[in-house]
């Protein structure tokens, strides 16, 4: 109901932690500083009622499926889909914390696309359904290089490859 939503949503909140209140009778757990949970809770949000935008800046057709929009810059290509958004948040968290060795995604064919290898100057060579590393660039630890890596991940990984890496929690 609208009344229940209004008690859970604080329209003035600027992060998920300050925008989305725990339901009545519940408390938010304490999470360690620099943990992924803390990162998600403190990630900046766009103002309340902001529309979800597509890569080209147009509005997504269903604007009733979200209660908040992360202040995450859009990329120009139509690559970031459902699972890609989850992969991006994880990768952004590890990149921001300098934990580059933890950025690793399996492509749909099972190939392990390690960001540490990418930033060392290796690039992924695809030949049919096979992938391999080829040293073809200079080492680069810039954010632009990270975004190029993520474009490859978005192109060749997705829900299927994430499912093989996911662990159940219950």
Question: Predicted segments — roles?
Answer:
Residues 2-64, 68, 73-81:
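N-terminal module-boundary/linker segments of secreted carbohydrate-active enzymes
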Residues 35-38, 114-117, 145-149:
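Exposed alpha-helical structural elements
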Residues 73-78, 94-108:
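Surface-exposed patches in mature extracellular/periplasmic domains of secreted proteins
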Residues 78, 82-85, 89-90, 142, ...:
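Stable alpha-helical elements in mature extracytoplasmic
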Residues 90-97, 126, 153-157, 161:
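Sec/Tat-exported extracytoplasmic proteins
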Residues 109-126:
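Charged, often glycine-rich, active-site loop that binds/positions anionic groups
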Residues 127-150:
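Low-complexity, serine/threonine/proline-enriched polar segments
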Residues 144-170:
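...with weaker cross-activation on analogous glycine-rich loops/strands in unrelated enzymes
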């Amino acid at each position: 109901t609208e009344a229940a939503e209004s008690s859970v949503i604080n329209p003035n909140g600027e992060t998920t932690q300050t925008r989305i209140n725990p339901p009545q009778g519940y408390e938010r757990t304490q999470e360690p500083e620099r943990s992924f949970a803390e990162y998600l809770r403190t990630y900046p949000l766009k103002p309340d009622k902001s529309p979800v935008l597509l890569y080209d800046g147009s509005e997504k057709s269903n604007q009733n499926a979200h209660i908040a929009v992360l202040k995450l810059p859009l990329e120009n290509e139509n690559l970031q889909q459902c699972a890609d958004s989850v992969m991006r948040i994880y990768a952004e968290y590890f990149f921001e914390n300098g934990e580059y060795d933890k950025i690793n995604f399996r492509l749909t064919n099972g190939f392990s696309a390690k960001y540490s290898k990418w930033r060392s100057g290796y690039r992924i060579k695809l030949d049919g359904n096979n992938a391999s590393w080829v040293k073809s660039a200079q080492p680069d630890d810039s954010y632009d290089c990270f975004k190029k890596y993520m474009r490859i991940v978005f192109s060749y990984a997705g829900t299927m490859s994430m499912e093989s890496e996911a662990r159940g929690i219950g």
